[in-house]
């Protein structure tokens, strides 16, 4: 992929009419840690709709993940009135949980 020393693993999740490609890069040993912010160019995250955001926050906290803030109320866009929260997985990938209004 143009990165000397990097290796990747690829998996596909398929359903009728849909295909999701999951790519995991294993960085070369000389790669330092990078912590991106939601406002940074190239930022990526995965989002999940949930029924009870407070229950999810409690569950991920119990599992050792730390939300980046308390759930916030969404005040613009298609999710206006809902609640959202970000956390990071052990690899630093940002995960968003969103509860619809």
PLM region descriptions:
Residues 97-101:
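Short beta->alpha transition motifs characteristic of CBS
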Residues 1-17:
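Short, structured active-site "lid" loops
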Residues 15-20, 24-91:
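Vicinal oxygen chelate
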